[in-house]
Every structure is written in structure tokens, then in C-alpha cells.
């Protein structure tokens, strides 16, 4: 999987399935490399990604992010491998610990210490048994990592990081922690871009 320099992060829950597929096809036609979609209280992110992958041919579809409290690590590993095998290695798994109000308030889970909880999750995902047809290439994972400890974990156990809503200074610091060979998929909000189609 080779990411292009520009992708789009968008919530698609307000769109019908047909409109979300049409949106993904438009992005693909415009030359964007990836579509990142979120997971909160709408569609389950892996089923949403499967739909978008099935309706595109070159676009990378990424979970930005899949909440680790929404499923166990074995389920995440199976989904990641299955989606990559089915799509020709076009699925990028973004994982995150989410936020206390969503985890405890909405999902009714106990929110653990973020770095320790994520480490345990990643180790479980790595050890997960998978007996279906494997994807051609090893699937890639990035972490929703903002602080230095989560960025260090991303560098140690994953392919990189997906920081959300951060400054250029943070991006520079994240690159220093991750090193030159890890993915750094930064979400930057566009204030004015001067284009009518986005």
C-alpha cells in the first residue's frame, strides 16, 4: 500500500450508503489517495469501510479511527486482514482509545490507561489466530497518537500515527518521535481552500 500525499477525512454517517459510495468514487476520480472515516455512534467502521472499498477500485479506505473499545483485538485483526484480502490491500487500520465520555458514558466500558490499554490491544491483535485466506501484503496499522508516549508506542508496535487536529509544530515533533520510516497521516482541517467541489 502506497499512500499519496493528500487524502480526505470525512464523516459519512449523515450520507446514505449510496451517497457515501458516490462520494468515495468522486474522491477517487479527483485523485485523492485515501478516504479516512470515523467511528462514534453511527455506522460500525469496518462495515462502512467494506462498503466503500467495494464501490471503489484504487482509493485506500482507512478507519480514522476504529475505537478499541468497540471490539476486541481478535475481531479487529480479522477485519483488517479480511478487508485487505478482499480489496487488494486498500484498507488502512487506524486505531484509537477514543475519549472517556464516549467509552464510559455511551458504551459503558471502563476507560483504561490509554498507553497501557493500547499496548495490550496491539499485542492481542498481533497474536490473533487467522485461518482465512491472507492478504497479499502485511496489513498496516496506525495509531491515533497525540502525546509522546502514544507516539512512541506507535513507533514501536505499528506502522505509524494518525494525529487529529494538530499544529505543524506537533507534526514536526511527531515525526521526530516516529522516525523517518513510519507513516505520519496527519489530519488538518481546511479553513479555506478556494475550491467549490470540497
For the regions a language model picked out, list residue spans one by one.
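Active-site-adjacent structural elements that line small-molecule/cofactor binding pockets in enzymes
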Residues: 1-197
Amino acid at each position: 500500500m502506497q499512500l499519496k500525499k493528500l487524502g480526505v477525512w470525512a464523516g459519512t454517517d449523515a450520507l446514505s450508503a449510496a451517497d457515501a459510495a458516490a462520494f468515495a468514487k468522486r474522491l477517487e476520480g479527483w485523485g485523492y489517495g485515501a478516504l479516512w472515516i470515523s467511528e462514534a455512534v453511527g455506522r460500525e467502521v469496518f462495515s462502512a469501510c467494506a462498503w466503500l472499498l467495494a464501490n471503489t477500485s484504487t482509493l485506500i479506505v482507512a478507519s480514522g479511527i476504529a475505537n478499541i473499545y468497540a471490539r476486541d483485538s481478535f475481531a479487529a485483526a480479522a477485519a483488517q486482514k479480511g478487508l485487505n484480502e478482499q480489496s487488494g490491500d486498500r484498507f488502512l487500520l487506524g486505531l484509537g482509545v477514543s475519549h472517556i465520555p464516549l467509552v464510559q458514558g455511551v458504551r459503558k466500558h471502563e476507560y483504561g490507561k490509554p498507553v497501557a490499554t493500547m499496548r495490550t490491544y496491539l499485542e492481542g491483535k498481533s497474536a490473533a489466530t487467522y485461518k482465512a485466506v491472507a492478504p497479499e501484503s502485511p496489513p498496516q496499522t496506525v495509531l491515533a497518537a497525540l502525546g509522546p508516549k502514544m507516539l512512541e508506542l506507535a513507533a514501536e508496535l505499528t506502522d505509524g500515527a494518525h494525529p487529529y487536529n494538530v499544529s505543524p509544530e506537533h507534526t514536526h515533533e511527531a515525526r521526530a518521535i516516529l522516525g523517518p520510516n513510519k507513516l505520519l497521516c496527519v489530519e488538518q482541517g481546511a479553513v479555506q481552500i478556494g475550491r467549490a467541489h470540497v
